Amino acid sequence: MQQLNPSEISEIIKQRIAGLEFSTEAQNEGTVVSVTDGIIRIHGLAEVMYGEMIEFEGGVYGMALNLERDSVGAVILGDYRGVAEGQKCKCTGRILEVPVGPELLGRVVDALGNPIDGKGPINTSQTDAVEKIAPGVIWRKSVDQPVQIGLKAIDAMVPIGRGQRELIIGDRQIGKTAIAVDAIINQKGSGIKCIYVAIGQKASSIASVVRKLEEHGAMDHTIVIAATASDPAAMQFLAPFAGCTMGEYFRDRGQDALIIYDDLTKQAWAYRQISLLLRRPPGREAYPGDVFYLHSRLLERASRVSEEYVEKFTNGEVKGQTGSLTALPIIETQAGDVSAFVPTNVISITDGQIFLESSMFNAGVRPSMNAGISVSRVGGAAQTKVIKKLSGGIRTALAQYRELAAFSQFASDLDEATKSQLEHGQRVTELMKQKQFAPLSVAQMALVLYAANEGHLKDIEVNKVLDFEAALLSFAKAEYADTIAHIDATGDWNGELEGKFKELITKLKASRTW
């Protein structure tokens, strides 16, 4: 019988212990107490962070929104029908992140960055947090570079700059989305990346917008984020934040981006629904107390950041370049009531508003912008030199026209000066009309504004003004292509260019009768 040496036994045990694979992992687990309308109450989930991702059985995720003494209230991100009472769930230790990067351009994704356009997976290499702190005061720069929308009324009277927040507000079905889509189409070739966030809209409406962008070759520089009316309230609430994170990717690397939130009213409705289901105390119009903070923390992230910020963020890879994220939030009003809770909140947060009126839309003035109460708080600082020089008289003419038009209804005989002002105002109002998907370049806009300012429309019938404009632009393209190209490239305005414009209009008028 073989004798075992005690030292050998101890050696074998040591080897076994050394080769033993064991790992302990502490998991923070809880139990689902109730599931109602996409809201899940969880018991026993200690040390969970606000906004942390929670993993349920079946690979479904939720987000912690209410942290109470003995329970956690979470919203489910996806289909909650597989989650049942008594199931286990665990913390992930991660805040919600979405994919970011240029790979997303040309694609349609949901609020979590998952592709929904049937074009296969998106191979992004980076993700970023949905909730981020806006850049501080010290990292910001003043807004002084233009974002050309391509619409005469907006670029002339309410100029938008890179890094600005300009609200588009009005009733339903009066062209709010049309302005936003035109803005995206006009960025083709400008280097500005666009993000269109559709919140709570019909899937057919979103498909129509995507189709229009594809038709005009604008999808190559655009990301579309869709949280449709059939998506859970949590997705509609998160979509704008996800879009903002995708836009910040470009801003932080010294590029320019434009984001459109269509519309923030539906995001506020979704947030109200979530808050009421979480049993948070309701306030005015049943909105929770922090609905202002919901929109302010989102819109403050749109900014123009300094060269130092970009250099620091990119670790010195990008130098001497500013970055910007321009926001065009849309708010839907009920019967023109801008004094409701959400409209007043967003008006106070943004740097100006484009107010669209139903009466003007129904009268055929499209875009139906009311020039009297629409304003850009950045103003001329963000306009190109030529547009700034030529647009001054347009707002004045429209303001005087509105005042005199109201007065002339009661007065029977008007003096010649008043009649002249009224007629000029009528022509300018007609000139500000513009078809959808037909944005103008800087030079084309300058030519049209010059014709209005210098009284070249006086002898044109009001109903022929738009025909004259079309002929003018066509003639300029054929005969004065160099002048148009020069203004488009430089934005300059001087006596020589003014002479060319005058000569152009005179030649056109001499060539045919109006």
UniProtKB/Swiss-Prot annotation:
Compartments where found: Cell inner membrane
Family assignment from sequence similarity: Belongs to the ATPase alpha/beta chains family.
GO cellular component: plasma membrane; proton-transporting ATP synthase complex
Reaction(s) this enzyme catalyzes, per UniProt: ATP + H2O + 4 H(+)(in) = ADP + phosphate + 5 H(+)(out)
Pfam families linked to this entry: ATP-synt_ab, ATP-synt_ab_C, ATP-synt_ab_N
InterPro entries found in the cross-reference section: ATP_synth_asu-like_sf, ATP_synth_asu_C, ATP_synth_asu_C_sf, ATP_synth_F1_a_nt-bd_dom, ATP_synth_F1_asu, ATPase_F1/V1/A1_a/bsu_N, ATPase_F1/V1/A1_a/bsu_N_sf, ATPase_F1/V1/A1_a/bsu_nucl-bd
Enzyme class (EC, first level): translocase
Site annotation Required for activity: residues: 374
The keyword Membrane is assigned to this record: yes
Annotated organism of origin: Cellvibrio japonicus (strain Ueda107)
Protein name according to UniProt: ATP synthase subunit alpha
